[in-house]
A protein has these predicted regions:
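Long, charge-rich alpha-helical interaction segments
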Residues: 142, 146-149
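Short, basic interhelical loop/turn and adjoining N-cap
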Residues: 152-154
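Short acidic-glycine loop/turn motifs at beta-strand connectors
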Residues: 121-123
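Nucleotide/phosphate-binding catalytic cleft detector across ATP-hydrolyzing
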Residues: 1-105, 125-138, 159-267
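Short beta-strand scaffold segments in enzyme catalytic cores
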Residues: 115-119
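Active-site-proximal alpha-helical scaffolds that flank and shape metal-associated catalytic sites
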Residues: 108-112
């Protein structure tokens, strides 16, 4: 069952439990899953919430020794350090050299429940200019599913919508496909209009679109007169890859200066 949107993910243990299993799955994929584990954890928060929630989010994962079972295997996990970074910024870290050539860039992260925006000044995030909209792919899909049901009496799911938008083969009637395209175009325009109301004018500043919504909305964004120049990072792992790069760099600096501190590291 999909977890509903939560601004503060520390309110209960659901995200902590999901993180435990994500760690176990990643280590298994790397061939490093063992009964006793000690890890450094790199996580992220939406830019708008980073300043107020980062310490609380870091402490959320600092619980000493945690025992759980993964695929019938007992595991004892110790999270040694927690690194917290702004989402969106992390996703473009691999492009730092290219970004040095541009004085201002908006990073637009279209996720499941929200669209988050961060302003970069060359390669540095301007944490005073963060915007967030409660508009995302899940919200759009729910609206499309309801409209298709009402207009055409056909029950569709998220995968049907993605197939149509991405141009993959589908047996859906043409009128249903037309409805999906029309609603997606309308929703992408709504996102761009709302961003402009928040002084995110993509006619004056280039943008990098990331997140699952970047690939879905790409054709609509590229053809919009509201966007002068857009690059896309469709890899849904982009933020996670950036967290890893930032954390490795920070660990290296800590080792150089013999740092350690309280085990909570802020980006």
């Amino acid at each position: 069952q999909r977890i509903s949107f939560m601004r503060d993910k520390t309110r209960d243990d659901r995200f902590f439990i999901l993180t435990l299993f994500a760690i176990a799955m990643e280590l298994r994929k790397m061939g490093q899953l063992q009964p006793m584990l000690s890890v450094e954890l790199a996580v992220g928060l939406p830019p708008e919430h980073y300043g107020t929630l980062r310490d609380k989010f870091a402490n959320y994962f600092k619980r000493g020794s945690i025992q759980f079972v993964f695929n019938d295997t007992p595991i004892c996990l110790m999270v040694q350090q927690v690194f917290v970074y702004p989402q969106a910024y992390a996703a473009v870290v691999p492009q730092a050299e290219k970004l040095r050539e541009t004085p201002r860039t908006f990073v637009v992260d279209i996720g499941g429940y929200t669209t988050d925006v961060l302003l970069l000044r060359t390669t540095r995030p301007d944490m005073q200019f963060c915007r967030s909209l409660e508009l995302g792919v899940i919200d759009m899909n729910n609206a499309i599913i309801g409209k298709v049901s009402a207009l055409h009496d056909i029950q569709i799911e998220d995968d049907h919508i993605a197939d149509i938008i991405m141009g993959r083969p589908s047996i859906l009637p043409q009128e249903v496909q037309d409805t999906i395209f029309s609603e997606t175009r309308s929703y992408s325009s709504q996102i761009l209009d709302k961003l402009r109301e928040l002084k995110v004018d993509l006619r004056a500043t280039p943008a990098i679109f990331i997140g699952g919504g970047a690939a879905l909305f790409r054709n609509f964004i590229e053809s919009s007169p509201m966007v002068a120049h857009a690059d896309f990072i469709p890899d849904q792992r982009a933020n996670a890859i950036g967290y890893g790069m930032l954390a490795n760099a920070q660990l290296s600096r800590m080792q150089t200066y013999n740092g350690g501190g309280d085990g909570i590291v802020r980006g």
